Amino acid sequence: MSENNNDKITVKRTLTLKRSVLETSTVKQNFSHGRTKAVVVETKRRKITRTDEKAETPQPITKPHVAPQRSRPRFEDAKPNEPTAKSNLSSAEIEARLRALEEAHIQERIIREQAEEEARRAKEREESLRQTIQKTEIDETPQEEEEPTLQTQTPSLSPAQSQIEPINIPITPKNTTVIEKRKADETKEDDRNSRRTNLAKSEVRAPKVLKGADEKRRGKITLNSALDEEGSARGRSMAAMRRRQEKFKRAQNQEPKEKISREVILPETITIQELAQRMTERSVDVIKFLMKQGQMMKPGDVIDADVAELIAVEFGHTVKRVLESDVEEGIFNIADNPQKMQLRPPVVTIMGHVDHGKTSLLDAIRKANVVSGEAGGITQHIGAYQVEKNGQKITFIDTPGHAAFTAMRARGARVTDIAVLVVAADDSVMPQTIESINHAKAAGVPIIVAINKIDKPTANAQKVRTELLHHEVFVETMGGETLEVEVSAKTGQNLDKLLEAILLQAEILDLKADPQRTAEGVVIEAKLDRGRGSVATVLVQKGTLHPSDIIVAGNEWGRVRALIDDHGRHVKEAVPSTPIEILGMQGTPQAGDRFAVVTHEAKAREIAEYRQRLARDKAVARQTGSRGSLEQMMSKLQTTGVKEFPLIIKGDVQGSIEAIASALEKLGNEEVRARIVHSAAGGITESDISLAEASHSAVIGFNVRANKQARDCAKTQGIEIRYYNIIYDLVDDIKAAMSGLRSPEQRETFLGNAEILEVFNITKIGKVAGCLVTEGKIERGAGVRLIRDNIVIHEGKLKTLKRFKDEVNEVQSGQECGIAFENYEDIRTGDIIETFHIEHINRTL
């Protein structure tokens, strides 16, 4: 213990004055994002007396009396603690620490005053800046900072304020002593005095550097740099104030824009969205206007030009209506050159009733056998052929006689020059004969009557002539002008006379055409052939058609790759009145479409796209127009219970598909109708099966077959594919299938009456009526009605029918029996029981 005590009070440890002068402290540095670092600071000071320090202490400029008052009590308060501190500090060390503490308080007061002065000046600068911007509105560029320590986020100073020289000020009063200690490399008193003097002088002329200067130099903004000591936010930048002023100025000077009236170009059909864009209006505004008019539409709905014009006028615009068909100008109805007109062969259409021998007559003329190639021996296509008689050519067009091919006959009559009406001598005038007469009269073409089958014993040509008079067809033998020829396709009798009559009629008509102009004609038939693509049978009416010509037919266009005549030979040109097959169409045109040759492929594509768009828009417009209101839709669903029979039809040619669709439309009634989901020329593909599966449709193939992928897909999905080659069979099968969708007819048959004589109440059975059969008979399982005072009060079925104690199947008139009803016991004496039987009968179309 004595040794330890002696160690503590040894002379060596008490006389270490050098270590007491070297002061050690720890400073905690704060960085952005919450990072800190502890730094050890050692300060070496020289021992100086208190009197010298007092003499050298500078007096503050603003309030010189404050320093001695604040430093003295602190010094006196620290003195009593010296004896009781039990520390080894000398008086010089204590005085040095007190001096440092006093200096810190002086610097804190100076910095606080400088901060207040700087806040006042910043407020004045901001106020003057706002007034300057409002008055002059001149762009000012912020002045460059002279030193990095003076970087601030406040606007640039005025010229008077910018003359103040900046000075380095510690960032916070808390770290002032630490920063000065860090900068003090020497412990001389004159350095400390000069630094204190500079701080005192800076009170008057030094503006305070904002707290975020160092952080701004680093390129990062922290929470400490964003707020100053009093918690006030940073000032707005000059660019922000300028933007705010410009925005305010625009708002003050903004005037309501006048509505601009535009000239809106309206085609035949247009969508609501496109109409709004052409008017520079919003689609929502147009739809609101239509809603006020009672029409519910969407931006993608198509409207016609009349509705679009009303909308445009309502919105204050002018309208200029144009026709998109302008692209078709100049391709049809081109005037022929009279000097280049030449005689052309006549186009003759063979018309008449089915099985009257039209195709057989044409075969006899051509010396061919077309009938054997047609399924069922009936013509289901339009055939175009050319024969030669006495060096003159005649073009024949054979039309079907079946009732389903009305459209084909109408097309044949429109493109013809002469109509040959074939009437069977043993069958006389029939419905399709009358229809053919009407088609020929509507087309305005002359008629030549060919009375066929005169070789039959039952032939009666005079009866044919007489019946034709009822339809205003006056033959020459009856005093008229219509030529008539009695022929026999089987024996070839009088075929030459028929051809001579045709040539005579053509000579009377004086048929001419210009072969040197561009070709123009009509599509007779079209189909999709495997290996050859789309094949169109056309009749050239004007001009000459060559390979590599660009043609437009209906909604399709193409470049002619090959021309094939009726004998299957490739030809180099097709002159007027020539039937020809064209290869190279981009798609399959519709039968009856007109075709023409155009000069450029771009024009052909433009015309085809216009026609496709027109057809598509019209279809959409029809659907939109039939939409109706919600009340109409609901009432229609409640009142109409029409069942639909969906079908997908694929045929070999467009004409056959058209005939099938026309025949199926006639089968419908108020209960069931056929709906053709899709129809096209060509074979049955896998996409057709997928469509049938989605729409629950049956697939019909007319003279076509399904490929292997389609057959496998149909087998997997359970889709039925039916093949037909005769239109009779197809229509009959569809008719029978549609008849099955109709609800059966209920037919009631009266059986008999029985009078209730007594009512018995039997256990486990209930009430049983003892009856006497007065009329007819009573059968078990028949329907019964309970009649009381000539009013039917119950209708149901018999539960029990007994005679004496035995169950019987029927009871004849005049016999007594016991009758019990199912789920009904309100029977009385004197009631009449009527029995009947209901028969369900399937109805047909």
Swiss-Prot record:
Spell out the InterPro entries in the cross-references.
EF-G-like_DII (IPR053905), EFTu-like_2 (IPR004161), IF2_assoc_dom_bac (IPR013575), IF2_II (IPR044145), IF2_N (IPR006847), P-loop_NTPase (IPR027417), Small_GTP-bd (IPR005225), T_Tr_GTP-bd_dom (IPR000795)
Does the keyword field hold Nucleotide-binding? yes
- Region of interest: Disordered: 44-91, 119-256
Q: In which residues is GTP bound?
A: 352-359, 398-402, 452-455
According to the record, the residues making up region (G4) are 452-455
Composition-biased stretches (Polar residues): 156-165
Q: Which PROSITE patterns match?
A: G_TR_2, IF2
Instruction: List the GO terms this entry assigns under cellular component, sorted alphabetically.
Output: cytosol
Record key words, sorted: Cytoplasm, GTP-binding, Initiation factor, Nucleotide-binding, Protein biosynthesis
Task: From the UniProt entry, list the residue stretches annotated as the region G1.
Answer: 352-359
Segments of this protein annotated with the region G5 = 488-490
**Signal peptide region:** none
| Family statement | Belongs to the TRAFAC class translation factor GTPase superfamily. Classic translation factor GTPase family. IF-2 subfamily.
Instruction: Supply the PANTHER family for this chain.
Output: TR-TYPE G DOMAIN-CONTAINING PROTEIN, TRANSLATION INITIATION FACTOR IF-2-RELATED
Q: What does this gene product do? A: One of the essential components for the initiation of protein synthesis. Protects formylmethionyl-tRNA from spontaneous hydrolysis and promotes its binding to the 30S ribosomal subunits. Also involved in the hydrolysis of GTP during the formation of the 70S ribosomal complex.
What protein name is recorded for this chain? Translation initiation factor IF-2
Give the source species: Bartonella henselae (strain ATCC 49882 / DSM 28221 / CCUG 30454 / Houston 1) (Rochalimaea henselae)
Show the taxonomic lineage.
Answer: Bacteria, Pseudomonadati, Pseudomonadota, Alphaproteobacteria, Hyphomicrobiales
